[in-house]
Amino acid sequence: MSEPIENLTVDAVLEAVGLFCPEPVMMLHQKVRDLPAGGLLKVIATDPSTRRDIPKFCVFLGHELVAEQAEEGTFLYWIRKKPD
C-alpha cells in the first residue's frame, strides 16, 4: 500500500460490531453495491470469522482489500470497490 491507512479517505463506513456470521458479509455485500466504482469502504467488525470471510468476499467478487488491522478484538478492513 502506498500511503498509511490513517491518510486514506473513506467513502462509507460499515459498522458490524456485535454481529456474527453471516450478517457482516451480507451487510458488506449491500454496502459495496451502494458505493461508486473505486469507492473505499471501511468495515468495523468484532466477529473473528470476518478475518476469513471478508478477504474471500473480496477475491470472489473482484474488490481490492486495501488493508486490514486487528485491534483488541476489533477487526478493521478497507475495501476498494472494483471498477465497473
Curated annotation (Swiss-Prot):
Subcellular location per UniProt equals:
Cytoplasm
The record's InterPro entries line, in alphabetical order, gives: Sulphur_carrier_TusA (IPR022931), TusA-like (IPR001455), TusA-like_sf (IPR036868)
Q: Which keywords does the record carry? A: Cytoplasm
Q: Which domain of life is it from?
A: Bacteria
Instruction: Please give the biological process terms from Gene Ontology that the record holds.
Output: tRNA wobble position uridine thiolation
Give one Pfam family, short name only. TusA
Spell out the molecular function terms from Gene Ontology: sulfur carrier activity
Q: What is its main location?
A: cytoplasm
- The catalytic residues are 21 (cysteine persulfide intermediate)
> GO CC terms on record?
cytoplasm
Q: So what does this one do?
A: Sulfur carrier protein which probably makes part of a sulfur-relay system.
As for family, the record states: Belongs to the sulfur carrier protein TusA family.
Protein name per Swiss-Prot or TrEMBL:
Sulfur carrier protein TusA
Origin species: Pseudomonas savastanoi pv. phaseolicola (strain 1448A / Race 6) (Pseudomonas syringae pv. phaseolicola (strain 1448A / Race 6))
Phylogenetic lineage: Bacteria, Pseudomonadati, Pseudomonadota, Gammaproteobacteria, Pseudomonadales
Q: Which gene encodes it?
A: tusA
